[in-house]
Curated annotation (Swiss-Prot):
GTP binds at residues 337-344, 383-387, 437-440. The gene is infB. PANTHER family: TR-TYPE G DOMAIN-CONTAINING PROTEIN (PTHR43381:SF5), TRANSLATION INITIATION FACTOR IF-2-RELATED (PTHR43381). One of the essential components for the initiation of protein synthesis. Protects formylmethionyl-tRNA from spontaneous hydrolysis and promotes its binding to the 30S ribosomal subunits. Also involved in the hydrolysis of GTP during the formation of the 70S ribosomal complex. Residues 383-386 are annotated as: G3. Residues 437-440 are annotated as: G4. GO terms for cellular component: cytosol. InterPro entries: EF-G-like_DII (IPR053905), IF2_II (IPR044145), IF2_N (IPR006847), P-loop_NTPase (IPR027417), Small_GTP-bd (IPR005225), T_Tr_GTP-bd_dom (IPR000795), TF_IF2_bacterial-like (IPR000178), TIF_IF2 (IPR015760). This is Translation initiation factor IF-2. Its main location: cytoplasm. Residues 1-41, 112-219 are annotated as: Disordered.
């Protein structure tokens, strides 16, 4: 319906007799002088401000579309009263908010619903007003209900000023029975009419629907937490399903904690603890058990235990080569042989360099990697040490190689390290090419070498075998081309190929600390392409490739398979022979690195010797064991490892050599302070020197620093130092011998032998053995020694004397007396080792 405002003074319906449903228009008029009486304001433009009208039949009124109106849902004022005062009595209220042409439009969309509606259930509202003569509730509650019921008494003649859009304000007086009064706070002065409520006439929602809305709101506000709880619940269900299935086999290291073993076997740790308790072991879930115990425990569940290494436990899955395009790669050739048989000299002749001249003692003490270009292709050579101390280096060289070139001197023949190199090559299942060197020597005998090697399983092709032999002279440059041809021929037969499109993988050949560049690692790339910026894991450390250098020291951007390079950017010093692998992200590399470091610390802690009561009693019975403590510092990791193993081999049951610290780099202040903490620590520097600060500190703290450039010199000197710590052995030394010529009976003393000194000397208080017919009858001490009637200390050969032996009187003529004494003799470590072995066999 449409309400039309004119200049009339009174409100009248167009047709007072019409039904509410037929009412269409109502005219509202106001004279200017009526404004003083509190009637609605009408501005100069004709727009009424705050005009409020109501009719009792709002719910049944028909709505009419206003021409030109833009807001939907607009209704007119129902015709139900003759005056404004009567229209104010009750019913739904509407607010005139805009003007369309000459018509004021009543818009109910701006009114806000009563927030207190729905707080009471329908039954509660009815029961609340059941005894009152007030009209029954129409579905509203709170302020809305009071307003509908007539409001509260206010100042006489004040307009209807309650604004329900502002919420409850409090301070209302009790309701007064009688004609309807406007609701609102107590105050003075005219106030504008209140806006109409949206949803007028609708009953309040019941309490059940209100609780439903609260639950929906709670779920929306706590959506993330509820989703997380749901995920945890699903994961818990999955874990319960997993616990039911015990795998057929698990992989562990040499020792494993009960919790880790239970996790691998999909069991609860408490269950394994109960099993161990039944086996007589009191353990906790974080306590470690050895591999044998874990095997017995797993066998009860039908599970097999496999022992794996540190890197197998944290293996990085790599892309397979099944669907990749493989390309040819250069062969990796390791040169092996006995010391001083000409390995480095042969490589120098091939590369036209002089590396051997710059080596201390003329021997190689670390692995060198070189790339050589030939007319038929490129070859990567690895030069390994031949000294006995570098066994691990030779083993690593055989592991990462494709072909082994065995250098044997024609004059020396097969030596111990030659046999060891053959065993390493056979263990790695790589082909061997024998190069007989020094054929220019006059005493060279190649046939003897071939015969001895054939006995070891390396039969020459000329003799019907499958081993290629090449006679060379590195000094004269003879036969080197034939050696290169043999290598390339063997490589063609092997069809060496690699995947160039995957993440780079390889092996650490050597690692060291370079002044100004930090930690430098020599790497052989086995597959993939290594580029600057790649993240990787080397051993137990992660890093990012900052720079790559080839064997000539030139900076390059990438390294292809079989290429020996040096890389920068490691977080720690990896061990020689550790695996090297590029990862997809730095996060993955760091996670693997932290896990491997944790496993290594755990493994090192397991290797620490713990003192038990049995060991304590045993050490007390043996006496205190001397310890020779050393700190080893070297130029490269491989040399440090070789020196450490060589020195630890010197230990015996009486003297133990203990390496308390070993690392790569110069001798620094920390090393000196560590040695100063114990008075019996020696610092051994191999191809390194102390820093100026460390040298001053060592002199002040009186710490001994030994510097060596050749490994066997260091081993020999440490051996002599340990021999000085051995307790000297007592050795019987024969002083002389005498023959019994006559026996004298002396009262209260016993028998005394009159002897003739045949050789040497007879001494008082010396040891004497009584020998008859080659059998020692008695060994005792010379209690008295007389020459005629005088007591003497010693009698030399050619003289006669009287000899009394302590607690022995059964002398006979022709008996032989041997005089001896015990002397301390310094011992050798080899003798101590032999005595230890004999004691163990006994």
């Amino acid at each position: 319906m449409v309400a039309k405002v004119t200049a009339a003074r009174r409100v009248s319906c167009a047709d007072e007799n019409r039904t509410p449903g037929d009412a269409s228009q109502a005219t509202i008029s106001a004279a200017p002088e009526d404004k003083k009486q509190g009637f609605p304001d009408i501005r100069e433009d004709g727009v009424a401000r705050g005009v409020s009208a109501s009719c009792g039949a709002v719910q049944n009124a028909a709505s009419a579309q206003v021409p030109g109106a833009r807001t939907p849902g607009v209704i007119g004022v129902p015709v139900a009263s003759k005056t404004v005062e009567e229209a104010r009595g009750g019913g739904a209220k509407r607010v005139i908010t805009k003007r369309v042409g000459g018509v004021f439009v009543l818009d109910d969309s701006a009114a806000r619903p009563n927030r207190k509606a729905g707080n009471l259930a329908s039954g509660a509202r009815l029961s609340r007003f059941s005894r009152s003569d007030r009209q029954r509730s129409d579905g509203f509650s709170g302020t809305q209900a009071r307003a509908n019921a007539g409001g509260v008494r206010r100042g006489e003649g004040r307009p209807f000023a309650r604004d329900f859009s502002r919420g409850s304000t409090g301070g209302y007086r009790p309701a007064v029975r009688g004609p309807a009064r406007p609701a609102g706070r107590v105050g003075s002065g005219p106030r504008g009419p209140a806006p109409l409520q949206v949803g007028a006439g609708k009953p309040a929602q019941n309490k059940r629907s209100f609780r439903g809305r609260k639950q929906q709101t709670y779920q929306y506000q706590h959506k993330d937490r509820l989703e997380l709880e749901e995920k945890l619940l699903q994961q818990k269900k999955k874990n319960k399903e997993k616990l039911a299935a015990v795998p057929r086999s698990v992989e562990i290291m040499e020792s494993v904690s009960v919790a880790d073993l239970a996790k691998k076997m999909n069991l609860k740790a408490s269950e394994l603890i109960g099993k161990l308790f039944g086996m007589g072991m009191m353990v906790t879930m974080n306590q470690s058990i050895d591999a044998d115990t874990a095997t017995i425990l797993a066998s009860e569940y039908g599970c097999e235990v496999r022992i794996v290494s540190l890197y197998d436990e944290t293996i990085i899955e790599s892309v397979g080569d099944e669907h990749a395009v493989l390309r040819a790669r250069p062969p990796v050739v390791t040169v092996m042989g006995h010391v001083d048989h000409g390995k480095t000299k042969t490589l120098d002749a091939i590369r036209s360099t002089r590396v051997a001249e710059g080596e201390f003692g003329g021997i190689t003490q670390h692995i060198g990697a070189y790339a050589v270009s030939t007319p038929k292709g490129s070859i990567t050579f690895l030069d390994t040490p031949g000294h006995e101390a570098f066994t691990m280096m030779r083993a690593r060289g055989a592991e990462i190689t494709d072909i082994v070139v065995l250098i044997v001197a024609a004059d020396d023949g097969v030596m111990p390290q030659t046999i060891e190199a053959i065993n390493h090559a056979k263990a790695s299942k790589v082909p061997i090419i024998v190069a007989i060197n020094k054929i220019d020597r006059a005493d060279a005998n190649p046939n003897k070498v071939m015969t001895r090697l054939a006995e070891l399983g390396l039969a020459p092709e000329e003799w019907g075998g499958d081993t290629m032999y090449v006679s060379i002279s590195a000094l004269q440059g003879i036969g080197l081309d034939l050696l290169l041809d043999a290598i390339m021929l063997q490589a063609e037969v092997m069809e060496l190929r690699a995947n160039y499109g995957c993440c780079a993988e390889g092996r650490i050949i050597e690692s060291r600390i370079d002044h100004g560049r930090g930690i430098v690692a020599s790497v052989i790339v086995r597959r993939g392409v290594l580029r600057v910026g790649d993240t990787y894991v080397a051993g137990v450390y992660s890093g990012r490739v900052r720079a790559i250098f080839n064997d000539q020291g030139e900076k390059i951007q990438e390294a292809t398979p079989s290429m020996p390079v040096e890389i920068l950017g490691l977080e720690g010093m990896p061990n020689a022979g550790d695996p090297f692998q590029v990862t997809d992200s730095e996060r993955i590399a760091r996670q693997i690195s932290l896990k491997r470091q944790e496993l290594r610390r755990y493994e090192n802690a397991r290797n620490v010797k713990r003192i038990t009561l049995d060991k304590l009693y045993e050490s007390i019975e043996k006496g205190s064991v001397s310890e020779f403590k050393v700190i080893i510092k070297g130029d490269v990791q491989g040399s440090v490892e070789a020196l450490k193993q060589s020195l630890e081999k010197l230990s015996t049951d009486e003297v133990q050599l203990r390496v308390i610290h070993s690392s790569v780099g110069a001798i620094n202040d920390s090393d000196v302070m560590l040695a100063a903490a114990d008075s019996n620590v020696t610092i051994v520097g191999f191809n390194v020197r102390p820093t100026p600060q460390a040298a001053v500190l060592a002199e002040r703290e009186r710490v001994e620093i030994k510097k060596y450039t050749v490994i066997y010199q260091a081993v020999e000197e440490m051996e002599r130092a340990m021999e000085g710590m051995l307790k000297p052995s007592l050795k019987e030394v024969v002083l002389g011998s005498a023959e019994v010529r006559k026996v004298f009976k002396i009262p209260k003393v016993g028998s005394v032998a009159g002897v003739y000194v045949l050789e040497g000397v007879m001494k008082r208080n010396a040891i004497v053995h009584v020998v008859r017919d080659g059998i020692v009858l008695h060994s005792g001490k010379v209690s008295s020694l007389r020459r005629e009637k005088d007591d003497v200390k010693e009698v030399h050969s050619g003289f006669e004397c009287g000899v009394g032996v302590e607690n022995y009187f059964d002398f006979r003529e022709r008996d032989r007396l041997e005089c001896a004494e015990m002397k301390e003799v310094s011992r050798k470590l080899k003798d101590a080792a032999l005595s230890d072995a004999a004691r163990l066999q006994g």
